[in-house]
Amino acid sequence: MNTRDTLDTQLNVLESFNPIVPEGFKDCKYLMLGNLMPSIQQKVLDQLPTRPKLVVLDTMNFWMDHFWDDLMIALKGVDVLTINDEEARQLSEEYSLVKAAQKIMTMGPKYLIIKKGEHGALLFHEDKVFSAPALPLAEVFDPTGAGDTFAGGFIGFLAKTDDISFENMKRAVIWGSAMASFTVEKFGTERIAELTTEEINLRLEEFKNLMSVDIQLV
């Protein structure tokens, strides 16, 4: 379930959608631009009188195929781009994810998150790389929405802690990964809707154990 085939995309109402940001949200410090047409994402950002502390953008291969120029404009105004490995290779025309990341970060984003499904995620910033594991699950019911959940967990943690250092972004990636690991366990938002704080903490502990190792240097 690490790849997908887009058989058909119908924009329907989104093709002429004009987003209006409510006054109460125009002073937000953290902005997540969901996976919509790049021109719509840009319209949201343009309505904010003061640039947020952090702007995160999600996109996909369809926008790269059909709205490349608009996407290039949108990327210039964001801090973090989150995409999967297939999309990173398409966007950069590089197979190596390290080379892809370096090329994509010249397009505007200061940070890049490359999601690799069951193989975890990579966080890039300048010459720094953080590799986050995925939690091995015995059963995956439905991966739909896992990427959105990841993004929500990621920026939600950063907004809560109000710290956008690289070290804290590493923690945010783990938070996003943990939340996404719940989403795939049931259909839609069913699993997320029933989560308890205890379950989240236990899942985060599982991720900590995956990354913990005591090794002796030669």
Placement of each model-derived feature along the sequence:
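Short catalytic-loop micro-motif centered on adjacent basic/acidic residues
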Residues: 30-33, 56-58
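Short gly/ser/thr-rich secondary-structure transition/capping motifs
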Residues: 11-16, 59-65
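Acidic, amphipathic alpha-helical patches
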Residues: 21, 71, 140
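Conserved N-terminal subdomain of the carbohydrate kinase-like
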Residues: 1-32, 46-51, 201-218
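Catalytic beta/alpha-barrel core
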Residues: 32-37, 84
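Conserved phosphate-binding/catalytic region of the ribokinase-like
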Residues: 97-218
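Short beta->alpha connector loops
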Residues: 35-40, 60-64
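Conserved phosphate/ATP/ADP-binding segment of small-molecule kinases
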Residues: 46-54, 63-131
